[in-house]
Amino acid sequence: MEMLEEHRCFEGWQQRWRHDSSTLNCPMTFSIFLPPPRDHTPPPVLYWLSGLTCNDENFTTKAGAQRVAAELGIVLVMPDTSPRGEKVANDDGYDLGQGAGFYLNATQPPWATHYRMYDYLRDELPALVQSQFNVSDRCAISGHSMGGHGALIMALKNPGKYTSVSAFAPIVNPCSVPWGIKAFSRYLGEDKNAWLEWDSCALMYASNAQDAIPTLIDQGDNDQFLADQLQPAVLAEAARQKAWPMTLRIQPGYDHSYYFIASFIEDHLRFHAQYLLK
């Protein structure tokens, strides 16, 4: 591992690291915020997954999460949104390829060689964080848009791994919206049954009651993608039918930007702290 940057921040440290990923077959970067140590108890971790076109730095520089994370004693880990490099398959569109990994394991050429973000987030990155930093094994997950989709599927596919999950403007039903249909058809092929294991709504309908974890979703009602791409009401209906403990908050006037995230990230951190710090 190689440290690329380090900055003092709210008595903690904001760092950026590069490592060689055996899962993704390329070098990867991630950012991490280490809060000031409190006692001898290792702090819990909140993983943040960003959206289309982003990398590990968008949340770090725009969300303003460090102050509250420092106060609460929560480590923040921000991975990249896809594998990257000259040898990694790409596309001219902003919503496919590098910067648009959709947090799944691709099965189709040319994507399958590198695009295994699900395995990277489930296994390799948490193991790396555990081995290199003083953290506990208690973790939660959150994200925005494509990253909200990622956070939800990570939680739904791994019962018991996360204490809680939250999302800002997530893509909840990718099987049925243009972003998801484009990505899934390329990454996973035309068999739509294979798509269902990466769709939060399908996963929630298939979930067991004992696996439900506290879930918070914020959605701005002035989001230009709300009607065509996001459709959080579809997941809310699944949660209702499954009695899943989910709160969906529609925030008047807010759009899809990091101004929206910055406005409510404190709520999300305090939401996760209730369960991470038990």
Swiss-Prot record:
Output the GO biological process annotations, alphabetical, semicolon-separated: formaldehyde catabolic process
EC assignment: 3.1.2.12
Which reaction is the catalytic activity of this chain?
S-formylglutathione + H2O = formate + glutathione + H(+)
Q: Which GO terms describe its molecular function?
A: carboxylic ester hydrolase activity; S-formylglutathione hydrolase activity
Keywords recorded for this protein, A-Z: Hydrolase, Serine esterase
What GO terms fall under cellular component here?
Answer: cytosol
Note the InterPro entries from the entry: AB_hydrolase_fold, Esterase-like, S-formylglutathione_hydrol
What SUPFAM superfamilies does this protein's entry cite? alpha/beta-Hydrolases
Is Hydrolase given among the entry's keywords? yes
The source's domain of life comes to Bacteria
- Active-site residues are 145 (charge relay system), 223 (charge relay system), 256 (charge relay system)
**Root EC class:** hydrolase
Q: Which PANTHER family match?
A: S-FORMYLGLUTATHIONE HYDROLASE (PTHR10061), S-FORMYLGLUTATHIONE HYDROLASE YEIG (PTHR10061:SF1)
Q: Return the similarity comment.
A: Belongs to the esterase D family.
Q: What does this protein do?
A: Serine hydrolase involved in the detoxification of formaldehyde. Hydrolyzes S-formylglutathione to glutathione and formate.
What this protein is called in its record is S-formylglutathione hydrolase YeiG
